[in-house]
Design a protein with these regions (language model features):
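The substrate-binding groove and active-site-proximal loops of carbohydrate-active enzymes
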Residues: 1-6
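Active-site-proximal substrate-binding groove within the catalytic cores of carbohydrate-active enzymes
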Residues: 8-186
């Protein structure tokens, strides 16, 4: 197995040598290809196929974003559905979508999501702050914040899991300037 991995590294190095500026995407295979050597050679636009069609899709995606963002600044996933929870759960620095593009309702839902997403996308390159503990628990909230100090803007993603009894979540936001006034918008209630 190690010869296979070393061969893969050599292959990627040769591609980069022959094609300067080439950007390589690494499907992370559920995290099995998220080692430091691969991260040096590729970006991870697709973390895992394990979430497609899974009954735990939102929780899995949310947990991946919450955990990976500690140490991997650019990674992505996306959504295979156009409901608001699926789209927001897959939101991050990059992403992809697997929908029926012949379905006008699906295309409209994706268009509305993209209009919203494109306004905040630059913030996903900012500092990352987890606002809750990491959890797959369906009774818990999970939340995190991306903050761009240079823009004085943040995005907070907070998800109330399906069996959570608390209707509200109190968190301490990072990067706020004392005495500064802030405008708060909601993507979904």
């Amino acid at each position: 197995e190690i010869r296979h991995i070393n061969g893969l590294y050599a292959f990627l190095d040769e591609l980069a040598r022959r094609h300067p500026g080439l950007i390589l995407d690494n499907c992370a295979a559920g995290g099995r290809r998220l080692d430091f050597e691969m991260m040096r050679r590729c970006i991870v636009l697709w973390r895992s196929d394990s979430t497609w069609g899974a009954k735990t899709f939102p929780q899995n995606v949310q947990a991946m974003t919450h955990g990976l963002s500690y140490w991997l600044p650019l990674h992505g996933l996306g959504a295979a559905a156009t409901d608001d929870l699926a789209l927001r759960s897959g939101m991050g620095a990059c992403g992809g979508f697997s929908i029926n593009y012949r379905d006008p309702k699906a295309v409209l839902a994706l268009r509305m999501y993209l209009d919203r997403y494109l306004k905040i996308r630059p913030i996903f390159t900012g500092d990352y702050y987890p606002l809750t503990a990491h959890s797959l628990d369906k009774t818990a909230w999970i939340a995190w914040q991306y903050h761009r100090a240079d823009l004085n803007e943040s995005v907070v993603q907070a998800f109330r899991r399906p069996e959570a009894t608390s209707e509200t979540l109190t968190v301490k936001l990072r990067g706020l300037i004392p005495e500064q006034r802030y405008e708060i918008g909601r993507a979904h209630v």
